[in-house]
């Protein structure tokens, strides 16, 4: 009897090792080696309650059908809380299918960390299955999406993917957050943090107190050159301050970025270093009288230690927007 139990335990551990990995585990292989749709990406277990699919590092295109973010879920006593269900209804549905291998519990809430399309356009995939599910976002996210940016994001992704979002309807968040909320639900506690302006002016960071884990949205993008998607939305100094605040939170050990692998305080600090190095380099050449287009190659050279990051070749458009922030500070 004892031998049978040992065999069962070994089989269970083998199953879990295939299906999930811990937050500190090394991911095997390259994301580029995997097929582009969410169905082919593994569901990773980051903590006792948190699961995530690490998305590809490509911009939306026909092959990926727009999938690019890290859809995640928290399993509570009452059911799943989904964070950023992805960039289309199909991505949202695909993520739901993956969660069925963890539990048959329903989805009880959805959170969108900010207004960008790869984080909220998957809402419909959840709403179709759970029509009454509340979708939370910062009040500024809701305001901007309702003012027309939701349709702009849909049209942008549908164009980039050559029609992959043709059957995706817009499902807007309907529960406004301000930041500072402490939400107790299903046996867990969530703390909502809102930096005034970081990756955008709509960001929330979601702290899962019980698991010592924080969802960063796109304030954090691990080994992905920050700001390359929507630099016009960002505050560069604000992003660095938000990252510092997250690192200084002694109750958090694992950070889930909007793109890239899960992080610890060390890798988060490297991202702060990038922003500080970027602004310092731009300021150096600004004080020499250079315009943004004159200094672009020089700044890239100064930041060569980050050149292996995804989308580093697009740093030029980031420099032009960061230049404006430096100019305002030194006018």
Listing of model-derived features with the role each one plays in the protein:
Residues 1-8:
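Positively charged n-region of N-terminal signal peptides that target proteins for export
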Residues 8-18:
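Bacterial N-terminal signal peptides
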Residues 26-33, 248-253, 262-331:
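Accessory terminal helices/loops
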Residues 21-25:
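Boundary at the C-terminal end of the N-terminal hydrophobic targeting segment
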Residues 48-98, 206-216:
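Conserved beta-strand hairpin/beta-sheet module of binuclear metal-dependent hydrolase folds
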Residues 79-81, 87-89, 182, 189, ...:
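Metallo-beta-lactamase
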Residues 97, 101-178, 182, 201, ...:
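Active-site HxH/HxHxD metal-binding segment of metal-dependent hydrolases
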Residues 49, 74, 84, 99, ...:
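Divalent metal-coordination and catalytic microenvironments
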């Amino acid at each position: 009897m004892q031998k049978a139990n040992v065999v069962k335990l070994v089989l269970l551990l083998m199953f879990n090792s295939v299906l999930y990995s811990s937050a500190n585990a090394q991911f095997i292989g390259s994301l580029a080696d995997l097929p582009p749709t969410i169905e082919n990406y593994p569901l990773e277990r980051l903590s006792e309650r948190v699961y995530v699919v690490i998305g590809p590092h490509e911009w939306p295109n026909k092959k990926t059908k727009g999938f690019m973010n890290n859809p995640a879920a928290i399993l509570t006593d009452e059911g799943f809380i989904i964070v950023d269900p992805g960039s289309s209804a199909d991505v949202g549905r695909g993520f739901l299918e993956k969660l069925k291998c963890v539990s048959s519990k329903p989805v009880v809430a959805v959170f969108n960390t900010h207004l960008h399309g790869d984080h909220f356009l998957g809402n419909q995939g959840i709403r179709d299955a759970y029509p009454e599910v509340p979708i939370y976002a910062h009040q500024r996210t809701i305001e901007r999406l309702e003012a027309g940016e939701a349709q702009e994001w849909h049209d942008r992704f549908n164009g980039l993917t050559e029609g992959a979002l043709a059957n995706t309807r817009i499902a807007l968040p309907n529960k406004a957050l301000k930041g500072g909320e402490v939400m107790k639900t299903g046996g867990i506690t969530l703390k909502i943090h809102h930096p005034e302006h970081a990756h955008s002016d709509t960001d929330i960071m979601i702290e899962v107190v019980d698991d010592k884990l924080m969802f960063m949205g796109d304030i954090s993008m691990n080994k992905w050159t920050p700001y390359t998607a929507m630099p016009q939305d960002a505050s560069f100094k604000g992003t660095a301050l938000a990252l510092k605040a997250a690192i200084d939170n002694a109750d958090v050990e694992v950070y889930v970025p909007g793109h890239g692998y899960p992080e610890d305080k060390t890798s988060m600090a490297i991202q702060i270093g990038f922003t500080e190095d970027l602004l310092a380099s731009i300021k150096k050449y600004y004080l020499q009288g250079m315009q943004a287009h004159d200094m672009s190659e020089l700044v890239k050279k100064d930041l060569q230690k980050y050149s292996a990051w995804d989308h580093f070749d697009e740093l030029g458009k980031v420099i032009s927007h960061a230049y404006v922030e430096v100019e305002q500070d030194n006018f």
